[in-house]
């Protein structure tokens, strides 16, 4: 008897996090859908100079090329290290895939959006990836990404989770990202801040979204 198929989802952490810390932060959410999905975690390419003795603070790119720092509120003309991160994620997918979807938090969510846009423009390949999940997502404010952030994302189901009390990525910023997807997104608001919240209140919604994506996977196979 063959085992029940599951989704494989690649997860991208936020700024000043790492793969292992993000694994811990998503534990409760992953547990809710463990019968439907398996999750893998990729580490950011760039170290953040917070503490010279700590290697667990990572970034996907920097918005300030002097301080080598990042702010989601900072309009900038640079995206230092972005292309290296794109190449690293694409390589990770090639070597560890196939994956069915991407999941990101904060800067990781923005990175997921940019990867999808690059794939839709034909600049990179994301084989097998058909959906995305965003926690505290936002559109990059770097002018380097204008061609990507202005692109309508077509035929790509997505789920967007945002906090009404998020003071780092305000809800309207996450809603603006969701608006860029032509397929009507699933939007879930919580009353917390800049976190991956407990999703137990929304178990039926997230499980329903996952089941839809799993059904699509089975149909396409």
Swiss-Prot record:
Active-site residues from the entry: 106 (charge relay system), 166 (charge relay system), 194 (charge relay system)
GO cellular component entries: cytoplasm; nucleus
Top class in the EC scheme: hydrolase
Entry keyword set: Hydrolase
Superkingdom in the source lineage: Eukaryota
UniProt signal peptide: none
PANTHER family per record: ESTERASE OVCA2
Family to which this protein belongs: Belongs to the LovG family.
Name listed for the protein in its UniProt record: Esterase C25G4.2
Species classification: Eukaryota, Metazoa, Ecdysozoa, Nematoda, Chromadorea
């Amino acid at each position: 008897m063959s085992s029940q198929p599951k989704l494989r989802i690649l997860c991208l952490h936020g700024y000043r996090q790492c793969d292992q810390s993000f694994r811990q932060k998503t534990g409760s959410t992953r547990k809710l859908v463990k019968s439907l999905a398996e999750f893998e975690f990729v580490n950011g390419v760039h170290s953040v100079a917070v503490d010279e003795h700590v290697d667990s603070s990572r970034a996907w790119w920097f918005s300030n090329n002097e301080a080598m720092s990042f702010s989601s509120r900072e309009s900038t003309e640079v995206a230092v290290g972005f292309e290296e991160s794109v190449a690293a994620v694409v390589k990770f997918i090639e070597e560890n895939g196939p994956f069915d979807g991407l999941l990101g938090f904060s800067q990781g969510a923005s990175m997921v959006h940019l990867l999808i846009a690059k794939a839709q423009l034909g600049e990179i390949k994301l084989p097998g990836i058909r959906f995305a999940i965003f926690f505290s997502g936002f559109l990059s404010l770097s002018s380097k990404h204008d061609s990507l952030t202005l692109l309508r994302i077509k035929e790509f189901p997505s789920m967007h989770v945002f906090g009404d009390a998020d003071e780092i990525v305000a809800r309207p910023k996450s809603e603006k990202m969701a608006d860029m997807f032509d397929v009507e997104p699933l939007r879930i608001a919580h009353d917390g801040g800049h976190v991956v919240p407990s999703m137990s209140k929304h178990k039926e919604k997230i499980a329903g979204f996952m089941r839809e994506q799993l059904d699509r996977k089975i149909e396409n196979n």
